[in-house]
């Protein structure tokens, strides 16, 4: 890092390069923040588990959490930014008590991409609800035939479609403007657990299923998927019988430029797909992924500090740890641990603030931030310290000289 500072002073490195390296360095120093404690607000015992977290997409100030006891809590993260004391206990801003709206556990939460006044929640009770944050009242409710594993908004779309993955081999599209369903996407042969919209094309949707396939859809067409990823790269993506994982595909995440799609499955593997060719990049992260979740979708945190920087992934593991990975290099960076054997159910990254929040089976929400470097010693402190060498020297020169 000192070499970058020196190069910047000499004008040898552009500011963007220095900023990129600084952000990546800080990301690699993520650690539990001991100064911020977040109150447990989702009950006790097994029903106190935190199943979902989401941070608003506009100013990154509000966070919503959902528990296994069906409660929903809204948190104001600005209190963290404005804290003056060393220790802060963060409490909820508003809450939906257990069993007052959803009847069973929350499975997924997402903010409306263009407004932090709306968020959505899905549950084991077969419903998808749209919420008004100011009143914390339901605006719409969509009811499915079975439990909902996950759902997703498009980050760029002109439409207001919400893709839902529920205990079915098809994907249901819900239109928030009309309050009704538009159509279903059929092609999987097992339950669909994960869905995620392409960040560059508002009509392209990715899905992952218990049949071991990761598929791409054009929602303007009612036909089957236009691509099915092949982990062996033997067949073209147009082959509908390809296999993507040796197990259930339970998580998906796009890079911000949509050039790559990451999928994770119960085979304890993360695969990185090149979206220009549809081929498996064959990135291997080693035996550090522990992922056997089939109750709801896993949401890996895709982190790219700047458009020209490396892409990192924070992956919540079943063993209570977070794995920090360099996605395109296929390398393991470091393991972040809460010293608990209870699995981390969810993780949410707060852009521009370099903070990460995680929720676990114990009902805890933790905050992670770059570990602070030790402050350099002040000159004033050095001046007040006892200088033994100087004292010895002074004592020697002050000895009177005598002549025999």
From Swiss-Prot:
Keyword flag DNA damage: yes
One GO term of the biological process aspect: proteasome-mediated ubiquitin-dependent protein catabolic process
Transmembrane regions listed in the UniProt entry: none
Highest rank taxon of the organism: Eukaryota
Subcellular location per the Swiss-Prot or TrEMBL entry: Cytoplasm
PROSITE patterns from the UniProt entry: WD_REPEATS_1, WD_REPEATS_2, WD_REPEATS_REGION
WD repeats: 45-85, 101-141, 187-227, 244-283, 339-378
Listed name of the protein: DNA excision repair protein ckn1
Organism this protein belongs to: Schizosaccharomyces pombe (strain 972 / ATCC 24843) (Fission yeast)
